[in-house]
Amino acid sequence: MQEGGLPRAKKRFGQNFLVQPQIVERIVAAIRPASGDHLVEIGPGPGALTKSLLRLLPQFTVVELDRDMIAGLRALAPPEQLRVLQADALEVDFAALAGAGNALRIVGNLPYNVATPLIFHILEHAEQVRDMHFMLQKEVVDRVVAMPGSKAYGRLSVMIQAYCAVESLFTVAPGNFFPVPKVDSAFMRLIPHRPGLLPPHLQAPFARIVATSFAQRRKTLANNLRGILSADDLRGLQIDPGSRAETLDQAAFFRLAEATVEQGNRS
């Protein structure tokens, strides 16, 4: 144990424990948990948020990778109220976790090193997720919510916004965590689109065209997409071949993905 009775944070898990009760209250107010919610908390650590949720929910699930946290979490409530899974959230089958019940509400203070892959892992089951509320590095949140033409706008913005409505709710200073991180954090909300914007057959082509378009940010689309779509193809899609990926909106990337599928069908 370290000061304040907190378990020792482990660098390999990217642990920074939230220690400010007022921030916990803001998180709970943003989530607005209600009886009947199928809520999953990822990375509860010593349980600062978990304890507040237990006062409001008759039952929910936490997923914690660190074995040393498990006994403390299980001591917070009986198993019929708090289901504790010792697991890597990147390997959790969220579709199976949802089962035939209500869509999942997922919340967590995510380690910076796994936040992005974890969000994409959860989005593989977006149809079984009602919403997500995450504490992330502020720089990552800024990139997720960025709009075309801004410096922060990039592959991450386009990909996540294709699946979710996104909103940055509030910024959290480093001093609200222990150990104190070197950067600001931000709390954000992601709500999967209903119905989804991307049909299944377009999801892989969309991911490929977005990755290729942003592969070299300083290059034009005509250069980045050479061998995939010609300058004339781009003009036919009402896209300037001389523009850069960070100027394109979501609809333009949808058109690019559809064009690559049509091209593949013709060849």
From Swiss-Prot:
Major subcellular site: cytoplasm
Recorded protein name is Ribosomal RNA small subunit methyltransferase A
Q: Tell me which InterPro entries the record gives.
A: KsgA/Erm, rRNA_Ade_diMease-like_C, rRNA_Ade_Mease_Trfase_CS, rRNA_Ade_methylase_Trfase_N, rRNA_adenine_dimethylase, SAM-dependent_MTases_sf
Where is the protein localized? Cytoplasm
Q: Which domain of life is it from?
A: Bacteria
Report the EC number(s), separated by commas if there are several: 2.1.1.182
Endpoints of the signal sequence: none
Membrane-spanning segments: none
Name the chemical reaction catalysed here: adenosine(1518)/adenosine(1519) in 16S rRNA + 4 S-adenosyl-L-methionine = N(6)-dimethyladenosine(1518)/N(6)-dimethyladenosine(1519) in 16S rRNA + 4 S-adenosyl-L-homocysteine + 4 H(+)
What family does this chain come from, according to its entry?
Belongs to the class I-like SAM-binding methyltransferase superfamily. rRNA adenine N(6)-methyltransferase family. RsmA subfamily.
**Function per UniProt:** Specifically dimethylates two adjacent adenosines (A1518 and A1519) in the loop of a conserved hairpin near the 3'-end of 16S rRNA in the 30S particle. May play a critical role in biogenesis of 30S subunits.
Q: Which organism is it from?
A: Acidithiobacillus ferrooxidans (strain ATCC 23270 / DSM 14882 / CIP 104768 / NCIMB 8455)
Q: What Pfam family is a match, any one?
A: RrnaAD
Q: Which GO terms describe its molecular function?
A: 16S rRNA (adenine(1518)-N(6)/adenine(1519)-N(6))-dimethyltransferase activity; RNA binding
Q: Which HAMAP family match?
A: 16SrRNA_methyltr_A
Top enzyme class of this protein?
transferase
Which PROSITE patterns has this protein been placed in?
RRNA_A_DIMETH (PS01131), SAM_RNA_A_N6_MT (PS51689)
The record's Gene Ontology cellular component field reads: cytosol
Keywords assigned by UniProt, alphabetized: Cytoplasm, Methyltransferase, RNA-binding, rRNA processing, S-adenosyl-L-methionine, Transferase
Q: Which residues bind S-adenosyl-L-methionine?
A: N16, L18, G43, E64, D88, N109
Q: Which PANTHER family match?
A: DIMETHYLADENOSINE TRANSFERASE, DIMETHYLADENOSINE TRANSFERASE-RELATED
Q: Give the encoding gene's name.
A: rsmA
